[in-house]
């Protein structure tokens, strides 16, 4: 028996069993995996369905909330709209009622005004009736009085006729002439008075025209003098040099010039204060020369002060000559020119006296020419009318008396002498030119802005201070400083000893208190300086 086929059959059966087992196992495994996959898919689908259901539920909730919110808003808007309509209805009703009230009030006001007007009309009519009644009563009384006057006149005429009937022709003519003369005398007096008034008005008009023409032809512009001068410094370091060691430079400067030096916080400026324009000009020139030279010490200050005093004298002469040529009087005596030049540094109520004199001279010449008088002589008289003011501080007497004596001394024309003497009414004017100059003087002084009373009073007080100090024996110089709050007195050392200085200060203080009126306090300073000078050769 061939075993090979059996073995092959068995082997084939075994292989078939194995293959069958493997197939069955594979099928079983495949079925399990399919079942698991199906389960997973089912779970996934369930999860998806649950998520979808939840989302749909959320959407339904949100939609419900939106619908609820929309319903609330609509309800709120409807409520607001209802409230607005109700408010508008109430406002309209209130406005209508208020308009009706205004109309009622307006009608009442108009009715009240109408009643007031009617009341006023009735009052006016009542007053008019009362006035008419009073007027009729007055007229009735006037008529009664006139009737009485007429009756009285009739009686007088009857008596007059009875008297005339017994007169002769000559007597009747004399009576008629007397009555006519009495009637005409009043008319004649009226005509004479009218003629005099007409002449006066015409003369005033002519005089005004002459004065207006004269004033329009004069251009006399000048500024009221001040009491301060400023000097500009190159830099603020110069202030210390001006003061000097222990203040010796500034003390020397003030003592020699009589001018107060004010050094304050104002940058690069030094102020020179003093009421005397000549002293102030000398001080200004000296200060500028010191700043330019650079050497600032007491000896140099003294040297420059003396030099500038001489320079001022020359300038005074030049001022006088220029003024004389300006008004057409070149033949004026040289000494009178110099004296007139001093008026450049003199003020009267703040008005520069030299410019005032030139203005008066020009006005006088123009007015004299209009009136047919000697214009040259009028200009000369007007120019010299205040010449006494140039030296009235050195010579006793008023400026009128001093000016009159100067004019006589230098043999001026008698008309000029009388003009100077009479321009303030001290003596009677003897010529038309004297009257013209007085009028021109008043015109120049009265021009608005020409003079300042307060400045003149201030300067007069300072002058009085110095005059009181100078009235004591042994006083060399005195200077009013600090706007009149200090009087500094320089004494002669050979006449006033040290033990007398205190007594002198006390006496000056007492005299100031008894003779002057001033605000605040016045410091009295007396300085006695002994100086010995020698030269080494």
From Swiss-Prot:
GO terms for biological process: mRNA catabolic process. SMART domains: HDc, KH. GO terms for cellular component: plasma membrane. Residues 227-287 form the KH domain. It comes from the Bacteria. The chain crosses the membrane at residues 4-24. Residues 353-446 form the HD domain. CDD domains: HDc, KH-I_RNaseY. Keywords: Cell membrane, Endonuclease, Hydrolase, Membrane, Nuclease, RNA-binding, Transmembrane, Transmembrane helix. Endoribonuclease that initiates mRNA decay. This is Ribonuclease Y. It comes from Streptococcus sanguinis (strain SK36).
């Amino acid at each position: 028996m061939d075993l090979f086929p059996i073995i092959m059959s068995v082997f084939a059966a075994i292989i078939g069993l194995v293959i069958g087992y493997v197939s069955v196992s594979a099928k079983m495994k495949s079925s399990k995996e399919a079942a698991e996959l199906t389960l997973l898919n089912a779970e996934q689908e369930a999860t998806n369905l649950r998520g979808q259901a939840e989302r749909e539920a959320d959407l339904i909730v949100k939609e419900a909330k939106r619908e609820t919110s929309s319903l609330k808003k609509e309800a709120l808007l409807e409520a607001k709209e209802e409230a607005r309509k109700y408010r508008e209805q109430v406002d309209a009703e209130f406005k209508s009622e208020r308009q009706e009230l205004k109309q009622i009030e307006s009608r009442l006001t108009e009715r009240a005004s109408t009643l007031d007007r009617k009341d006023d009309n009735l009052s006016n009519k009542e007053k008019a009736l009362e006035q008419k009644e009073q007027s009729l009563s007055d007229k009735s009384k006037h008529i009664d009085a006139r009737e009485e006057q007429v009756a009285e006149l009739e009686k007088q005429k009857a008596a007059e006729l009875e008297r005339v009937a017994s007169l002769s022709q000559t007597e009747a003519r004399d009576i008629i002439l007397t009555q006519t003369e009495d009637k005409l005398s009043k008319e004649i007096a009226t005509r004479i008075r009218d003629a005099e008034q007409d002449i006066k008005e015409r003369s005033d008009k002519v005089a005004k025209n002459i004065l207006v023409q004269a004033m329009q032809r004069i251009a006399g512009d000048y500024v009221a003098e001040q009491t301060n001068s400023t000097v500009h410094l190159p830099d603020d370091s110069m202030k210390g040099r001006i003061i000097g060691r222990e203040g010796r430079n500034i003390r020397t400067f003030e003592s020699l010039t009589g001018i107060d030096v004010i050094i304050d916080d104002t940058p690069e400026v030094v102020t020179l204060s003093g009421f005397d324009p000549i002293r102030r000009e000398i001080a200004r020139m000296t200060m500028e020369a010191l700043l330019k030279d650079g050497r600032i010490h007491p000896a140099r200050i003294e040297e420059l002060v003396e030099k500038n005093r001489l320079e001022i004298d020359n300038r005074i002469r030049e001022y006088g000559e220029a003024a004389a040529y300006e008004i057409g009087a070149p033949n004026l005596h040289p000494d009178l020119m110099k004296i007139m030049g001093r008026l450049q540094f003199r003020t009267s109520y703040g008005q520069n006296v030299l410019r005032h004199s030139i203005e008066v001279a020009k006005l006088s010449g123009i007015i004299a020419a209009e009136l047919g008088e000697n214009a040259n002589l009028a200009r000369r008289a007007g120019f010299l009318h205040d010449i006494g003011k140039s030296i009235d501080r050195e010579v006793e007497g008023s400026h009128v008396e001093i000016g009159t004596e100067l004019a006589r001394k230098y043999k001026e024309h008698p008309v000029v002498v009388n003009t100077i003497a009479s321009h303030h009414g001290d003596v009677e004017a003897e010529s038309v030119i004297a009257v013209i100059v007085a009028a021109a003087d008043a015109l120049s002084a009265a021009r608005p802005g020409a003079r300042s009373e307060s400045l003149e009073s201030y300067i007069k007080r300072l002058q009085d201070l110095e005059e009181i100090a100078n009235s004591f024996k042994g006083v060399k110089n005195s200077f009013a400083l600090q706007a009149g709050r200090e009087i500094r007195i320089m004494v002669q050392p050979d006449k006033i000893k040290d033990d007398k200085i205190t007594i002198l200060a006390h006496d000056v203080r007492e005299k100031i208190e008894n003779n002057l009126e001033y605000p605040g306090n016045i410091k009295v300073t007396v300085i006695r300086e002994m100086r010995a000078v020698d030269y080494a050769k």
